[in-house]
Amino acid sequence: MTRLGVTVFLATLVMATEYPAPLVREEQEIVVDGHKEVWQLRWATAPEAFCSPKLISLTCPCLGFAYGESGDLSLIRLRDGAEIDRMHLTQFFSEERERAMLQRWPADPDKDAGAANERDFADRVMQRPAVQVMQFGDYDHESAGSEFYLQTGTQPCGKSAGIVVGITAVSPHLHPVTTASHPDRPLVLFKHEWEALRDAKTSPLDILDTPCGDHGAETETHVLIRWGRKGIDGSRREYTCPAGGAPKKLVRQDPL
């Protein structure tokens, strides 16, 4: 089957069986300021297959996107059935692709690696429950949990990196989470760093970003994050990797 054929088949199957409505990848109910809303992840046109169910999709570049879809994507707020807010999400993904990517069906690398070459493998994958993208949480520690993590890329090897989007104390409209130092650009962190921030009880928070030796890293990198009334802020710090148990030394520090 040609790439175009696979794309059309996947899009048709998904829309017919799992999409809440045509082009709506996912919708979730949420309460904002006492009002019930429906938030939708909506494609502008039928999405194409991305990292389709094959063995190669279990490799590092596809981690978090395996068995997914790509296209032009927006996040939309509906109240009483009427659109009240919209944010274009494609702009936050790779400029080279100019497309947003979302995982559609979950991958199981341990089991899938041995089954990926079987003829009915793709059919079995598409019977799995869809991955829930909008998993709301309180990342800025100032809102009612109306933000969610959105993977926008991967880093070697297969580290999920992305942004958090939604509504925070900074603005009542849809927006990406930024920092006080750089309010004009989305804050990009690894998924485990966003999760640590969401679950943290005290500020500041020191998170290991890249350990010594990770893919040849000659320094150890930490992310220091603090939050308060002015929003989220912090720094990225690099330390030496001394031998023999000697203490690490700070060699570089940049604001987030």
Each model region followed by its residue ranges:
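Acidic, small-residue rich beta-repeat scaffolds with periodic aromatic anchors
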Residues: 16-83, 190-256
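Short helix-loop boundary/capping segments
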Residues: 146-192
